[in-house]
Amino acid sequence: MPRYRPLLLGLATLAACEGPQPPAHQRIMDGDPRFGRTVVAASGCTACHHIPGIKQPTGSVGPSLAGFGRRAYIAGRLPNRPAMLTAWLLDPPAIDPATAMPAQGLSETEARDVAAYLYTLR
């Protein structure tokens, strides 16, 4: 082990010099959670969902999105991964024809921003 110590020390030093990493939702998705919050508020998502931080009338047709960033699944059965969430937000019925969630007409950028915002809900 002693002869590997300089190598390990060098690798640890390089890792420390890399600097802070952006949050995972920004690294993976390149979405902006601030814009996503604005899109959520403007798109009427609270008509069906309770969304912490959005002060509008809250519906109960869809699930609460509190803690969404910690969930393992989207819509109860799809893996909660950034690409899947973005695809879901773009056109839920294309992924699950039986879903009650309609397509909201979001652009790809808006969907990434909304996904980034949803991942901040922990």
Question: Predicted segments — roles?
Answer:
Residues 13-16:
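C-terminal motif of bacterial Sec signal peptides marking the signal peptidase cleavage site
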Residues 20, 51-52:
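Cys/His-rich metal-chelating microdomains
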Residues 1-7:
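Bacterial N-terminal signal peptides that target proteins for export
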Residues 9-11:
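Low-complexity proline/serine/threonine-rich segments in eukaryotic and viral proteins
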Residues 38, 56-122:
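Extracytoplasmic electron-transfer domains, predominantly the class I c-type cytochrome c fold
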Residues 23, 54-55:
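Short, non-ligating residues that shape and space the ligands of small metal-coordination modules
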Residues 18-41:
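Electrostatic cytochrome c docking/interface patches
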Residues 45-48:
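Short cysteine clusters
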